[in-house]
Amino acid sequence: MKKNKLSIKTIVAIGIGSAVFMILGRFGSLPTGIPNTNIETAYAFLSLMALLYGPLAGFLIGFIGHALKDIVFFGSPWISWVFASGIVGLIIGFGARFIKINQGVFKLKQIFMFNLIQIIANGVAWFLVAPTLDILIYSEPLNKVYLQGVIGGISNMITVGVLGTVLISNYSKTRIKKGSLRKEY
């Protein structure tokens, strides 16, 4: 019998994570002054979920959460940015191999590694994927979409760098450090 790739726990996390991402995306964002581009707290939450549940869950939480936000609050999804949100979760989820927050350790080395990974993830998603898909799918003007991508990417890097680091650090403090318990005789 094949081992199921997605556990019940992960599926529930994807559902709840997508709903929280949607709510944070709508009510936890600040406008940047660039049309349709906001400072989003949802990506700090996505980072935590991606590190906890891995790349597939990270992708699905970002993709489904962003799609739901667009559908519920704007009427239809902007698929290029929905896909980019999934890419952020996917790449950060691959970082779970290097950043084991469930082991109760999130010190300088892990903070540096997390921020390096999230900068790469946001750079790929917002500087490359979202604007390129905007041009290919929606025939949007080149200068507009790359400006939106750069502003969105930089704001997400800063938000995840600050809020994500604090959120993940606080979460890791709730975990028991590996090897910290001893058997009493």
Curated annotation (Swiss-Prot):
In terms of Pfam families, this protein maps to: ECF-ribofla_trS
Keywords assigned by UniProt? Cell membrane, Membrane, Transmembrane, Transmembrane helix
UniProt main location, coarse: membrane
Q: Which domain of life is it from?
A: Bacteria
Q: Which PANTHER family match?
A: UPF0397 PROTEIN BC_2624-RELATED (PTHR37815), UPF0397 PROTEIN SPR0429 (PTHR37815:SF3)
**HAMAP family xref list:** UPF0397
State the family it belongs to: Belongs to the UPF0397 family.
Q: What is this protein called?
A: UPF0397 protein CPR_1556
Query: Could you tell me which species this protein originates from?
Result: Clostridium perfringens (strain SM101 / Type A)
Record lineage: Bacteria, Bacillati, Bacillota, Clostridia, Eubacteriales
